[in-house]
A protein has these predicted regions:
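Generic secondary-structure transition motif, activating predominantly at the C-termini of alpha-helices
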Residues: 7, 49, 53, 118, ...
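His/Asp/Glu-rich mid-to-C-terminal helical/loop segments that flank catalytic regions of hydrolases
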Residues: 87-163
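Metal-dependent peptidase/peptidase-like ectodomains
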Residues: 1-98, 103-110
Length: 173
């Protein structure tokens, strides 16, 4: 809905960062990127993750089309460079238990709670992983906010042409 009636014009919107489904399983050695190869924001994510001692892991099943089904997609279609991270998109490498524990957390969540009545806050969650991910976004947002940089779509992205059409508007800034 926002992309159809934005408060600020999409051509002057720097970026969209989306964290879909909080990591409630504890701190992780990685962050899972959905839609690898789409925008320069991935470079920002890699730098911020490295500063935390983490790596970026691409989603394990891109054929599921999560990039095209998540909340940010209307902004991407409007040309705004987007970044989507989602630990349940595969491969969560948890500090306590590694990938095996991460895979089990994903199986349990998807199989038992995702979009069901138990898909609500739980006092047993370990939100340290969610805090890690939010800190990644804070660093990226602060960097973008303190610069005059406009992240771009990568060559080959189907959204690049839309953003390129409005490049002149951003040069005026």
């Amino acid at each position: 809905a926002y992309a159809k009636d934005p408060v600020y014009p999409l051509e002057k919107t720097v970026a969209n960062l989306t964290l879909d489904i909080l990591n409630t399983a504890g701190p992780a050695r990685d962050v899972v990127l959905v839609g690898e190869g789409q925008s320069e924001l991935e470079d920002d994510l890699a730098r911020a993750a490295a500063a935390q001692g983490r790596s970026v892991t691409p989603e394990t099943l891109p054929e599921n089309g999560l990039f095209y089904r998540a909340d940010h997609f209307s902004l991407a279609r409007g040309g705004v460079p987007v970044l989507l991270i989602m630990q349940i998109a595969g491969g969560a490498d948890l500090v306590d238990g590694g990938r095996e524990a991460g895979d089990q957390w994903i199986r349990d969540y998807i199989g038992n709670c995702y979009h069901q009545t138990c898909d609500a806050w739980n006092a047993d969650w370990d939100l340290r992983g969610a805090v890690q991910d939010m800190e990644l976004f804070r660093v990226i947002i602060e960097d973008l906010g303190n610069s005059r940089r406009w992240p771009q779509w990568r060559a080959g992205s189907e959204f690049k042409a839309i953003r390129d059409q409005s490049a002149e508007v951003r040069r005026e800034e």
